[in-house]
A protein has these predicted regions:
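ATP-dependent adenylate-handling active sites, centered on carboxylate activation for C-N bond formation
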Residues: 9-13, 114, 124, 190, ...
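Small-residue-rich helix-loop
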Residues: 476, 480-484
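Cysteine-centered catalytic environments shared across enzyme families
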Residues: 1-298
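Acidic, carboxylate-rich catalytic segments that either coordinate divalent cations
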Residues: 502-551
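Short, surface-exposed acidic
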Residues: 153-155, 467-476
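Alpha-helix-centered segments that form part of catalytic cores
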Residues: 96, 173, 399, 405-406
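Core structural elements
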Residues: 408-420
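Charged, glycine/proline-rich intrinsically disordered loops and linkers
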Residues: 74-86, 484-503, 509-510
Length: 551
């Protein structure tokens, strides 16, 4: 769903044009709601979009990927009542927490021209806002707002996006446009003054928690969600995403062993064919039917030719539209189950290690070698390192986090890419993300960072993985062979497609990795460490320069 709201009704024409520029399958399902308070244009979807217009105010409901009503008066469905400022009527509405999925509610007062926004713990639809000379604008994407009023490019955000892969909340690529924080009540006055307060705070890490108990809680939450999905679709079949990662394997094997949900595994190969090959192997072992869907190879070339920048949100939204069209053609699939965000919840945010590196650089004054990240290489200087560290601090503050909280504090920024999956314009099936529930969000904060670092991710998914947690694909091993030939001269035997941790080839990889590590450490005069015992091919960023010397 795409939507743009403006408190200035004269913007209706340009808003319509801006919405039409987004490549959606059915732009004809556009909904326009106008009044004395302004205008709102939204594309139709199974995401609920409701507008309750009265003499005193307008109440808009955004979100709920379950395809049901997102708000019901006095229904008592959710245990998280919406809060609001005194005098508002938001407290009469409750978020539909049927699957503990996110929602947001917007209230516009016609008399005071103020806006109240209530955001859930996990923003299923990202909401961005801009205030310009008394005009308040909201949208589901910063790119949508950027085309209506003049904007200036935020160079710091661009550097952060290119070097870290995301932009810290509440910043965007545009200086004037900000992202709304989760679990907050935000009031925007008619003069542009913004006030916000938190209605939920994440728990602090439980240093005394038993890891086995945390794992059992994780299993209980996921299984409970799968059973609720099954009960929502009695006698109907669905689809489970299956990629190269452990998360989707865990979801598939749990559903099979616990005999919940009738489903077909689906692999969406939007880029590399490695996930498709991994999914095919896992599906064969699990005896699950698999459908692989690949995007045309020239898609991104056409996207760039059409003027859509890769570092914005257009590519992500286009991926979502492609996935929606493809999944909509699956016969008999009434719902989709995915496994986004598990990495951040069980292993800490993917950016935490990089931020630790740039903080160290900022303190030492020594520049890092180029940071190899998509879509290009960035020179990390002490100035950039200090800027990134400052942005992380701002992001934590805007999200109400403290240094004692888990590194998941920047989860809102990190999941913009995942939420692009939810931003597609049309959908004829329900989408469920069992990892994106309030129960698991709280669990992720309770897990100490030391545990996330020490405990291998495969541990959280036992005993459901059944020996499939340590496999490596042949195509991945070809890349590893080239690396070790450069570093050690030791070639890897290419025996079979799947490598188990107990096999001789895996042990040979460990020996080769340790040999390369020792030799490069001695050559550079400082210790080089591995990312983990179960990843012998992956060396840390500090070895990039050393590996170049081995070519």
């Amino acid at each position: 769903m795409d939507f743009i709201f403006s408190s200035d009704r004269s913007h209706e024409g340009v808003i319509r044009s801006r919405i039409m520029e987004i490549e959606t399958p059915e732009t004809s399902r556009m909904t326009v709601t106008s009044g004395a308070w302004g205008t709102c244009v939204a594309t139709g979807s199974q995401y609920s979009f409701g507008a309750l217009d009265s003499e005193s105010d307008l109440l808009m409901v955004l979100g709920d990927p379950l395809g049901e009503r997102s708000a019901r008066r006095d229904s008592g469905i959710s245990d998280v009542p919406l809060e609001a400022h005194p005098g508002s009527r938001l407290h009469e509405y409750l978020v539909d927490g049927g699957m503990e999925h996110p929602s947001a509610i917007v209230r516009l007062s016609k008399s005071t021209r103020s806006i109240d926004l209530v955001t859930d713990v996990y923003l299923g639809i990202p909401i961005f806002f801009r205030v310009d000379r008394g005009v308040v604008m909201l949208a589901s994407s910063p790119d949508l707002l950027a085309g209506i009023l003049p904007t200036s490019f935020d160079a710091d955000s661009a550097i952060e996006r290119l070097s870290m892969g995301f932009i810290s909340s509440p910043h965007t690529l545009y200086t004037e446009i900000k992202a709304l924080p989760p679990a907050s009540v935000i009031r925007i006055e008619a003069d542009g003054t913004v006030r916000d307060r938190k209605w939920w705070q994440p728990p602090l890490p439980d240093e005394s928690a038993d890891v086995a108990d945390l794992r059992e809680e994780l299993h209980a939450s996921i299984l409970s969600t799968l059973r609720r999905i099954d009960s929502r679709h009695p006698g109907q079949s669905g689809a489970f995403t299956l990629s190269a990662g452990l998360d989707s394997r865990f979801m598939v094997t749990m559903a099979l062993k616990e005999q919940v949900c009738d489903f077909t595994a689906v692999n969406l190969a939007l880029g590399s064919n490695i996930p498709a090959r991994t999914a095919a192997h896992v599906a064969r072992r699990a005896h699950v039917p698999l459908i692989s869907i690949r995007r045309p190879t020239d898609f991104y070339s056409r996207l760039l030719l059409n003027g859509h920048p890769e570092i914005g949100t257009n590519a992500c939204i286009a991926d979502a539209h492609f996935a929606d069209r493809a999944l909509g053609e699956l016969e008999g699939a009434q719902y989709l189950v995915g496994g986004f965000s598990a990495d951040e919840m069980l292993k800490g945010s993917s950016s935490s290690g990089q931020y630790a590196a740039v903080r160290e650089v900022a303190q030492s004054g020594e520049p890092l070698p180029r940071l190899a990240t998509y879509p290009q290489l960035i020179d990390i200087t002490p100035t950039i390192a200090s800027m990134l560290d400052s942005r992380q601090t701002q992001a934590r503050r805007s999200l109400g986090m403290s240094e004692s909280h888990s590194s998941l504090a920047d989860h809102v920024s990190l999941h913009r890419a995942s939420f692009g999956h939810f931003a597609a314009a049309t959908r004829n099936y329900a989408v469920y993300e069992p990892f994106m529930t309030r129960r698991l969000i709280e669990l992720s904060y309770r897990i100490p960072d030391a545990v996330k670092t020490r405990v291998p991710k495969s541990y959280w998914y036992q005993p459901y993985l059944g020996g499939q947690e340590t496999g490596r694909l042949f195509s991945t091993r070809v890349k590893a062979e080239r690396l070790f030939r450069r570093a050690t001269g030791i070639g890897l035997k290419q025996q079979g497609e799947w490598v188990q941790s107990e096999g001789p080839l895996w042990k040979e990889c460990l020996v080769a990795a340790e040999s390369a590590r020792s030799r490069l450490s001695a050559e550079l005069g400082h210790e080089i460490t591995m990312k983990g015992k179960r990843r012998p091919m992956a060396l840390t960023l500090s070895t990039a320069e050393a590996l170049q010397r081995c070519t």
